[in-house]
């Protein structure tokens, strides 16, 4: 798949108008306010191809829906041409710092995948709560659900199933990071959700949001609410009335096309009770898997995916010390791989790994 995107020629006027609307007197001033360089900004504004992440960054800065602006080659669908991985260069084989970036790096959870996709195959779509301790892989599973069905088979491992849905390109997946303060208010969240279904507005109240969503939801849409704990424990305007409206939208005003999948450290009904919320929204999650350690067979498959093979004794040690928890597996595998790449670390990698394990387990 292409690793870069460009603005469609007929969308360039919209981009330049957005620059003016935002009050930037020049390209240089705009470039000073974003991460991408001035040369990248100039390419973007001319309709030349730039890196996927830079394209998304610039569109977000201008409050534009990147999916509306992107130039798509003829006879190729948007979903199948967009890159499924972050940044430039090869994917890091082990990365404990971030959720799994690409489906090929996701291991295990087959039971959860079967159940989740089974609930999303037919109308009405059903709601799911993914529960687990910190760093149990909740966000990775959430992102995997959105990516796996539209990732080309040649980019997956031979043992991975991807044909979970009958018509995967019909589905729209909307990821919401509720730890992002910009999405922790009605205004920010409304704009984010409406942009995802192709609507860009300046202001929106709850009634307008309900009207717009119920009118424009024409395809299966799954809203992924990651770390819902963050907003329920925060003093914000996402109150019971807001959550009740989301329940009403999914249950009565979306034609069965809308589902919510949330992640939390405890069941949403318990979380709501602990944080003073009484909305019936938190009772609509019939399937609520609790993520634990991986099955040992899946953990071994993960460890054996190293680009440099580990010795059997090292694999056994990693399995034992990690107890098959995905984050700890990733951490220890990273230590072992670095030692293979840098021989001076050979005598210390186990001790380094144990110290890191101790640090994270105490947090």
Language-model features: locations:
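Recognition helix of helix-turn-helix/homeodomain-like DNA-binding domains
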Residues: 32-50
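Conserved small helical "lid"/interfacial subdomain of P-loop NTPases
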Residues: 286-314
